[in-house]
Every structure is written in structure tokens, then in C-alpha cells.
Amino acid sequence: MDGGQPIPSSLVPLGNESADSSMSLEQKMTFVFVILLFIFLGILIVRCFRILLDPYRSMPTSTWADGLEGLEKGQFDHALA
């Protein structure tokens, strides 16, 4: 049919190109970005499981009102002056 001539394909890299240059810079940057997103996702999953297993470890023992001196809880008049 074609007379024995090979069909050019953009999916197959040419013989004179190395394996590194088969990916463009944009593809390499996208690949690195996706890998970084997977690492970030893994860190978040580990952190969520740690919070689920021991939820009271990450909570502070004091409340916001413990630091107020001379003021009753909920009274904010002249607190910044």
C-alpha cells in the first residue's frame, strides 16, 4: 500500500534524540509540580491521621482568657491601652 515506507509518528521519538529531550521543559515542570503536590498530600494525610489518633495532644492546655489580668472574661474595654 505505502510502498514499504515508514509512517512518521509524533509519538515515537527520532533515533538521534536522547531520552531526556523527549520531554519538553513544560512537561518536566508539570511532572515536578505534580510530584510536589503528591508529597504535600501525603504530609496532610499523615497529619490528619495523627490528629485523629490523638486529638488532645495538639490542643493547648490554657484558654485565651487565662492571660487577662484584672479583667473579667468577656470584658474588653481599655484592654489594649
Swiss-Prot record:
Major subcellular location class: membrane
Localization in the cell: Membrane
Residue intervals passing through the bilayer: 29-49
GO CC annotations on file: membrane
UniProt similarity note: Belongs to the cortexin family.
Cross-referenced PANTHER family: CORTEXIN-1-RELATED, CORTEXIN-3
Protein name in UniProt: Cortexin-3
Gene that produces this protein: CTXN3
